Amino acid sequence: MLLLLAEFLQQFYKGFAVFQYLSLRGILGVLTALTLSLCLGPWMIRTLQMRQIGQSVRNDGPQSHLSKSGTPTMGGALILSSIGISTLLWADLSNRYVWVVLLVTFLFGAIGWVDDYRKVIEKNSRGLPSRWKYFWQSVFGLCAAIFLYTTAPSATETTLIVPMLKDVRIPLGIGFIVLTYFVIVGSSNAVNLTDGLDGLAIMPTVMVGGALGIFCYLSGNVKFAEYLLIPYVPGAGELIVFSGALIGAGLGFLWFNTYPAQVFMGDVGALALGAALGTMAVIVRQEMVLFIMGGVFVMETLSVVIQVASFKLTGRRVFRMAPIHHHFELKGWPEPRVIVRFWIITVILVLIGLATLKLR
């Protein structure tokens, strides 16, 4: 929006041309979203408290979590608002990738909002039934996948890239739709499963989102893409603005979500942010790198799958409780220790993911 204004004002003052630089608009995206999140956060928390929109806590979980009961939830709306406003202000709104990521983010956020609303407002402990949650996730995920497939200008944008193996590129054809569906829906649910401790999900999301923003910036520049031997995706660089907005909004939310949390993001935030990460990775053909960098999300998801499968097949549980962050809590780890150690793991995995840019 402001990019259009800057382009118009260039005829009066050439200095406005500086807003053409993606790096500047990415930084402005961070600062705008961060400011919005920090300024709107206290008001949103008070509003949620006044309306008694608080988190309910399971009795069979760690006893330390009982003190969290009543903490305002659905704070993901703060994250999405900050991301949306910042992106609309600083991104090139004629770029199709910007709209794809925004729409996927907000549509998955809508699913989470309905789930949270039914749990918190209607006092329905089930929330949105799982079959309907996965149905709508599938609908939105498939719509995004089909759109990206049918509008891909070249085969490069539907080819599977294997990190560190520069000569291995697998044309997916229609299989691109299937892969994209699983990446978007899978990452959405993985982040949601991780969102069980104060600040546990948001910081890895910020780190992975920031790293994916770097991939988007490099893939959108033909010289960088050719030098690094990564797919050149025209227009993908504009997603650095969305990535910046995600970083700013996430850090602003963490200000209130850090231990002991004043607000939880709820499904409205977790489902949306996970879907955003998956969509960005798909656009720049870095699904495998997302799997590496989002290792904490993968670990949390696998712990649930293993726990359920083991109990159904043998009647025994592998972990004391799943997702795995609760297992460590029940082993006696203080909550802040679990959180920070998972953050450290994410830092390491993100650095490994970024290293694949040169290890080819």
UniProtKB/Swiss-Prot annotation:
Keyword Thylakoid: no
GO biological process entries: cell division; cell wall organization; peptidoglycan biosynthetic process; regulation of cell shape
Compartment(s) of residence: Cell inner membrane
Membrane topology: Multi-pass membrane protein
Cited InterPro entries: Glycosyl_transferase_4 (IPR000715), PNAcMuramoyl-5peptid_Trfase (IPR003524), PNAcMuramoyl-5peptid_Trfase_CS (IPR018480)
Coiled-coil ranges per UniProt: none
Cofactor or coenzyme needed: Mg(2+)
CC annotations in GO: plasma membrane
Organism domain of life: Bacteria
Function of the molecule: Catalyzes the initial step of the lipid cycle reactions in the biosynthesis of the cell wall peptidoglycan: transfers peptidoglycan precursor phospho-MurNAc-pentapeptide from UDP-MurNAc-pentapeptide onto the lipid carrier undecaprenyl phosphate, yielding undecaprenyl-pyrophosphoryl-MurNAc-pentapeptide, known as lipid I.
Classification via PANTHER family: PHOSPHO-N-ACETYLMURAMOYL-PENTAPEPTIDE-TRANSFERASE, PHOSPHO-N-ACETYLMURAMOYL-PENTAPEPTIDE-TRANSFERASE HOMOLOG
UniProt-recorded name of the protein: Phospho-N-acetylmuramoyl-pentapeptide-transferase
Gene name of this polypeptide: mraY
